[in-house]
Amino acid sequence: MKKTFYHYMMKHRAALFKNEISDLAEAMYDDLSFPKQSEDYDVISSYLELSGMLESMSIFDDAWDLYIQER
């Protein structure tokens, strides 16, 4: 069974060393409207762009690349 992007990112919460990806994971956790069941890049990317959660979408792109590598 594949993990959703949200489920994958939860392992980055409460990281020992804070970085942009761990900050994104915390923000996703706090956002009750985040599309938690999605595995679709376009759905998640659009949501993040419209929500204004990120200063730069490159943070999401980096997190997505890690997600794809570990699937």
Swiss-Prot record:
Cited InterPro entries: UPF0346, YozE_SAM-like, YozE_SAM-like_sf
Gene3D superfamilies assigned: YozE SAM-like
A Pfam entry, by short name: YozE_SAM_like
Highest taxon in the source lineage: Bacteria
HAMAP family, per the entry: UPF0346
Family in the record: Belongs to the UPF0346 family.
Name this protein carries in UniProt: UPF0346 protein BcerKBAB4_2120
